[in-house]
């Protein structure tokens, strides 16, 4: 596992965007051989999306031959609802880059058959072989996507009940009213995420400190689903200083020295 210890959340966004752009450019994607990118929603990746848009506008990366798969979607709110994850992605990223509409893959939270929708999504991912890079965030309780504590570490895309903690955290997007936050969502599984060639998780803020500690220094544990990253051959965690407060000093020092060349300029 790589840990990229930075100082501020804005640096996390810029580092992650530069990393994604480099991966895409090194891959040299074509229509027949697209780069497959997994994407999250929420507050944490906003800085990354902003930086990626800037790189695109500067001509430093193109998304014309990039296929995307999003992590999750709420059940029970319209696709055009301002807080649906479809709306989030178009408003904060897709509308500002050259991605082709047919290359955007999103879960449908309004289908009548959730099981069939989840199978369709897994099959679509498999049709591309694999996801080359999956970016994600992490919840205060260590969940990745909507894989809440006690989720199976081999789980696939499925319907999940959201914990009260998650709904409280997400209520900030619903005028602070938890009753407006959906109780269920469709989400990729931990196993789906681990199938990706590379996984990059962004961690910012002191509220995520215990989750980062569990991911880096703890044991692999289904109560902290982010800890499953320890099983991945190519996992990267990009974090700011407030999120590092529960890590041992020697842990931060070790990774700071190891990644010194890679964090210069950020």
Curated annotation (Swiss-Prot):
Q: Which HAMAP family match?
A: GlcN6P_deamin (MF_01241)
- Give the record's pathway: Amino-sugar metabolism; N-acetylneuraminate degradation; D-fructose 6-phosphate from N-acetylneuraminate: step 5/5
The protein's matches in Pfam families, at most eight in alphabetical order, are given as: Glucosamine_iso (PF01182)
- Subunit-level organization: Homohexamer; trimer of disulfide-linked dimers.
Q: Which reaction does it catalyse?
A: alpha-D-glucosamine 6-phosphate + H2O = beta-D-fructose 6-phosphate + NH4(+)
Q: Which GO terms describe its biological process?
A: carbohydrate metabolic process; glucosamine catabolic process; N-acetylglucosamine catabolic process; N-acetylneuraminate catabolic process
Function in brief: Catalyzes the reversible isomerization-deamination of glucosamine 6-phosphate (GlcN6P) to form fructose 6-phosphate (Fru6P) and ammonium ion.
UniProt record similarity statement: Belongs to the glucosamine/galactosamine-6-phosphate isomerase family. NagB subfamily.
Q: What is its EC number?
A: 3.5.99.6
Which is an annotated GO molecular function term of this record?
identical protein binding
Its top-level enzyme class, in one word, is: hydrolase
Claim: Calcium is one of the keywords in the record: no
Q: Could you say how this protein's activity is regulated?
A: Allosterically activated by N-acetylglucosamine 6-phosphate (GlcNAc6P).
Q: Residues in the active site?
A: 72, 141, 143, 148
A single GO CC term, please? cytoplasm
Q: Which UniProt keywords apply?
A: Allosteric enzyme, Carbohydrate metabolism, Disulfide bond, Hydrolase
Q: Where is this site: Part of the allosteric site?
A: 151, 158, 160-161, 254
Q: Which organism is it from?
A: Vibrio parahaemolyticus serotype O3:K6 (strain RIMD 2210633)
Instruction: Identify this protein by name.
Output: Glucosamine-6-phosphate deaminase
Q: Is Disulfide bond among this UniProt entry's keywords? A: yes
Q: NCBIfam families from the entry?
A: nagB, PRK00443.1-5
């Amino acid at each position: 596992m790589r840990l990229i210890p930075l100082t501020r959340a804005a640096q996390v966004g810029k580092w992650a965007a530069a990393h994604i752009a480099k991966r895409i450019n090194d891959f040299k994607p074509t229509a027949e051989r697209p780069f497959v990118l997994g994407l999250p929603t929420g507050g944490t990746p906003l800085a990354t999306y902003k930086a990626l848009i800037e790189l695109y506008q500067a001509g430093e990366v193109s998304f014309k031959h990039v296929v995307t798969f999003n992590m999750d979607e709420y059940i029970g709110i319209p696709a055009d609802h301002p807080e649906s994850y479809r709306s989030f992605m178009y408003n904060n990223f897709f509308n500002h880059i050259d991605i082709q509409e047919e290359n955007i893959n999103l879960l449908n939270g309004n289908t009548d058959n959730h099981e069939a929708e989840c199978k369709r999504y897994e099959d679509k991912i498999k049709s591309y072989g694999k996801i080359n890079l999956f970016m994600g965030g992490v919840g205060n309780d260590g969940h990745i996507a909507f894989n809440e504590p006690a989720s199976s570490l081999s789980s696939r895309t499925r319907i999940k009940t959201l914990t009260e903690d998650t709904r409280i955290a997400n209520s900030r997007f619903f005028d602070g009213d938890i009753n407006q936050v959906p109780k269920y969502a469709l989400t990729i599984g931990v196993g789906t995420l681990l199938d990706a060639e590379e996984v990059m998780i962004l961690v910012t803020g002191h509220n995520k400190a215990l989750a980062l500690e569990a991911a880096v220094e703890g044991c692999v544990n289904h109560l902290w689903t982010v800890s499953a990253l320890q099983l991945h051959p190519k996992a990267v965690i990009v974090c700011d200083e407030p999120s590092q407060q529960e890590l041992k000093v020697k842990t931060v020092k070790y990774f700071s020295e190891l990644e010194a060349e890679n964090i210069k300029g950020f």
